[in-house]
């Protein structure tokens, strides 16, 4: 997996994408984690997916900031994600403790906009981040808790869709 925020995004992504090409392995990249409209890493990840011909090989983890953008921007990114056959992993409790900010942005929950991604036919899986670490010392990695956060924050109440998120899409995302 990658975390381009901590380094130069372009250099980091070039290394990851070249590695994926040389090994044939899928990429899982943590992007748009800060819940702000100035982040555009999901879009940049799509651009790198196209640049390297990695369609169907890339998963965006988090993409919380995508929800902070205007609907027209989100729809443009969703179209790019469809064309890139990109998938997403939502870690709903990872940013639930997001501190208040004075920034003006679209009102939204601090989670991956899974409801919109699903409406655009984009695969969404469930995950957990920061398990029993310095950031989330009481997080135990419960996928049921994460799924509950996802269904409540995105109002995804279709049981068949939730099963698909928890099982089928998860298997697809990790390549089994």
Label the predicted regions:
Residues 1-59, 63-87, 104-126:
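Histidine/acidic residue-rich metal-binding segments in metalloenzymes
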Residues 38-40, 100-101, 136-137:
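Short Asp/Glu-rich motifs
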Residues 62-64, 92-101:
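Short, basic, glycine/proline-bearing loop/turn elements
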């Amino acid at each position: 997996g990658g975390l381009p925020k901590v380094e130069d995004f372009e250099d980091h992504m070039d290394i990851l994408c070249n590695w994926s090409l040389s090994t044939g392995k899928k990429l899982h990249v943590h992007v748009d984690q800060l819940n702000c409209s100035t982040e555009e890493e999901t879009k940049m990840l799509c651009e790198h997916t196209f640049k390297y011909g990695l369609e169907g090989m890339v998963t965006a983890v988090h993409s919380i900031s995508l929800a902070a953008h205007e609907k027209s921007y989100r729809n443009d990114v969703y179209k790019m994600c469809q064309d890139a056959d990109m998938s997403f992993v939502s870690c709903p409790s990872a940013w639930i403790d997001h501190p208040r900010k004075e920034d003006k942005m679209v009102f939204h929950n601090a989670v991956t906009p899974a409801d919109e991604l699903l409406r655009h036919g984009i695969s969404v899986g469930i995950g957990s981040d920061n398990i029993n670490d310095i950031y989330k010392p009481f997080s135990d990695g419960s996928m049921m808790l994460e799924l509950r956060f996802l269904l409540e924050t995105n109002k995804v109440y279709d049981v068949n869709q939730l099963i698909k998120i928890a099982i089928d899409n998860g298997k697809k995302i990790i390549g089994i």
